Amino acid sequence: MSSGKIAQVVGPVVDVAFATGDKLPEINNALVVYTDEEKSRRIVLEVALELGEGVVRTIAMESTDGLTRGLEVLDTGRPISVPVGKETLGRVFNVLGDTIDMEAPFADDAEREPIHKKAPTFDELSTSTEILETGIKVIDLLAPYLKGGKVGLFGGAGVGKTVLIQELIHNIAQEHGGISVFTGVGERSREGNDLYWEMKESGVIEKTAMVFGQMNEPPGARMRVALTGLTIAEYFRDVEGQDVLLFIDNIFRFTQAGSEVSALLGRMPSAVGYQPTLATEMGQLQERITSTKKGSVTSIQAIYVPADDYTDPAPATAFAHLDSTTNLERKLTQMGIYPAVDPLASSSRALSPEIVGEEHYAVATEVQRVLQRYRELQDIIAILGMDELSDEDKTLVARARRIQFFLSQNFNVAEQFTGQPGSYVPVAETVRGFKEILEGKYDNLPEDAFRSVGPIEDVVAKAKAMGY
């Protein structure tokens, strides 16, 4: 192992000088430095640039407090490597693969894999046309997810991305029964803690590996923790031949961490101050999240949209990699419609008659047509009132409002806040319910009966309780 000395520390970026003639560490290699003689505190650095004359620029994976010039730095000779395999299930890791769940640490000889790898080649890839049922009406009807596909949940601050991803974990991980990997990237530690204890109580933790690099951690950790979670998922896919669910909350923080260190690494910022390598970094991560002939990875990624601006380079770059997009809309939260999924902006490659069937496709497109027409009529209603509409449009508006409310439902994970039990609605029930609303079967029921309910039978029961 070659060794060098710290030449400069600027926040999370550390320059390390190696003696001329020594072999320089390769890009992405992990370097180790101890802050005291007893070697009680270890800091891991990752090589990002070679500056020439034996100096490399590195990004710290932990806080650089305690580092001083002249400290010895050792080259490990390989990238950061993390534990993989069945032993990772039920455990919680940080970016370096160290356990953080207060239970027994992993043995030094446990199987490990480097976090930097190449994406699968074209001939290894496979595509699926099997629908992944989520039990959430608005998703299953209008923007269905594919098994082995990539899903993005887009939304601004506080519109319900994390609650939706937790409900998907609750519904899919429990129904699916396979292996799940949850990766928390730059989000709140409290949410990760809540999720861990909920999973422990429900028993899902036994089939889940969790990896966290939260908001309070340096940008190096937030930039690489997604790769740690992905490496664990890839092992289950490639070696064990499993179908894996990969949840990532939040992909935007991965980009944000990259932009934090980009200027310190000496790169010129590009649009909106992001790193010039934004598209490359996103591509390298996303191309590894894929399904191969050995096994599948179904990934569900929350993506924060800064200031609700979908043209921002970070969410715009992520769009290109996804099969399905679920867009959360602030206006719907203001109307009290949860989940606040925009039925017209959300889209899916799976919404075609060949994949979902003729009936489902016909109902979904008619629902979208009715909602689109309602949106067009809203300006007229705001200026002239409902009376100026034709009878046909009045009926359409009444049905559109019922559809809009029926797209909401109670979540299991929100039961402690709402006091209402959550509901899981099978796809067939969802399609039947919306078909009957479109046919006018429930035109006589009040709009409020359609709010936050499960299947259409719940609407009828609610209306009955209201005296209809």
From Swiss-Prot:
Membrane topology classification: Peripheral membrane protein
Location within or outside the cell: Cell membrane
EC category: translocase
UniProt cross-references to PROSITE patterns, sorted A to Z: ATPASE_ALPHA_BETA (PS00152)
Positions with a binding annotation for ATP: G155, G156, A157, G158, V159, G160, K161, T162
GO molecular-function terms, A-Z: ATP binding; ATP hydrolysis activity; proton-transporting ATP synthase activity, rotational mechanism
SMART domains: AAA
Protein EC: 7.1.2.2
Gene3D superfamilies (UniProt xref): 2.40.10.170, Bovine Mitochondrial F1-atpase, Atp Synthase Beta Chain, Chain D, domain 3 (1.10.1140.10), P-loop containing nucleotide triphosphate hydrolases (3.40.50.300)
HAMAP family (alphabetical): ATP_synth_beta_bact
Subunit note: F-type ATPases have 2 components, CF(1) - the catalytic core - and CF(0) - the membrane proton channel. CF(1) has five subunits: alpha(3), beta(3), gamma(1), delta(1), epsilon(1). CF(0) has three main subunits: a(1), b(2) and c(9-12). The alpha and beta chains form an alternating ring which encloses part of the gamma chain. CF(1) is attached to CF(0) by a central stalk formed by the gamma and epsilon chains, while a peripheral stalk is formed by the delta and b chains.
Function: Produces ATP from ADP in the presence of a proton gradient across the membrane. The catalytic sites are hosted primarily by the beta subunits.
Similarity comment: family membership: Belongs to the ATPase alpha/beta chains family.
NCBIfam families cross-referenced by the UniProt entry: atpD
Protein's name in the database: ATP synthase subunit beta
Gene: atpD
